[in-house]
């Protein structure tokens, strides 16, 4: 069976969905074949790549990690990570989707699966993989065939209406990150409104306010990711967030 046939499906969403109805990790998931994989998605310009860089820098000396980025016709995000020395060049693969970023993380994930398999060949002992989606709309959401845990990044520059506009990314991501909170006063965005609406849209699904430029919120983000990994692997933690 080809990867195209294995990882191709079409979904139509009748509603934004609910946090407790989100896809869960597949029962037959083999973490020895592919390490625990985290998806980072969100609209264009919300700070996905900036956060991925900060996360990589925080974890790279403590864990064996690697990254796949998605762009439509360039490898801009991969080049950004390499230029800023988030990881060594061989640990970063840029995928050019050639079309809708949404499709590459859900409807047909084969390009990203190829890239992840290549990273596993290069680094058989890798512990944590990341897939950053290309910037897309609020309907974009990762397939659980591709990732085990999803982080959806929005920012305040789109206005405080964004959380209540919904979309599967906002309602069903494992973690919602509201970035660039320092810009709220410039665009008249009310953080209390965003907090209220995030709770309404996500129920008790976790969300947090963050600021990538100075790493505000990074400990919480990493804790959510590593806790999910530990739970999925049913293993005791073998690392800490901070160097001793």
UniProtKB/Swiss-Prot annotation:
Matching CDD domains: UreG
Binding positions for GTP per the UniProt entry: 42-49
GO MF entry, a single one: GTPase activity
BP GO annotations: urea catabolic process
InterPro entries named in the record: CobW/HypB/UreG_nucleotide-bd, P-loop_NTPase, UreG
CC terms in the record's Gene Ontology section: cytoplasm
Subunit structure: Homodimer. UreD, UreF and UreG form a complex that acts as a GTP-hydrolysis-dependent molecular chaperone, activating the urease apoprotein by helping to assemble the nickel containing metallocenter of UreC. The UreE protein probably delivers the nickel.
Sequence similarity: Belongs to the SIMIBI class G3E GTPase family. UreG subfamily.
HAMAP family for the chain: UreG
Name used for this protein in its record: Urease accessory protein UreG
Gene name for this UniProt entry: ureG
């Amino acid at each position: 069976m080809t990867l195209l046939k294995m990882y191709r499906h079409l979904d139509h969403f009748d509603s934004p969905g609910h946090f407790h109805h989100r896809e869960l990790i597949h029962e037959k998931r083999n973490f020895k074949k592919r390490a625990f994989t985290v998806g980072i998605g969100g609209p264009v310009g919300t700070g996905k790549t900036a956060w991925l860089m900060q996360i990589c820098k925080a974890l790279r000396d403590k864990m064996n990690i690697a990254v796949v980025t998605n762009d439509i016709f360039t490898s801009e995000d991969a080049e950004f990570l390499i230029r800023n020395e988030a990881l060594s060049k061989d640990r970063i693969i840029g995928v050019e989707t050639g079309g809708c970023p949404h499709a590459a993380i859900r409807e047909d994930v084969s390009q990203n699966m190829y890239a992840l398999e290549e990273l596993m060949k290069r680094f058989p002992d890798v512990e944590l993989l990341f897939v950053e989606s290309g910037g897309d709309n609020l309907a974009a959401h990762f397939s659980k065939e591709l990732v085990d845990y999803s982080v959806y990044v929005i920012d305040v520059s789109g206005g405080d209406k964004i959380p209540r506009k919904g979309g599967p990314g906002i309602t069903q991501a494992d973690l919602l990150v509201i970035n660039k909170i320092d810009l709220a006063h410039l665009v008249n965005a009310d953080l209390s409104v965003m907090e209220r609406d995030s709770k309404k849209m996500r129920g008790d699904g976790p969300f947090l306010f963050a600021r990538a430029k100075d790493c505000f919120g990074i400990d919480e983000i990493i804790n959510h990711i590593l806790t999910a990994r530990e739970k999925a692997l049913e293993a005791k933690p073998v690392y800490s967030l901070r160097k001793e």
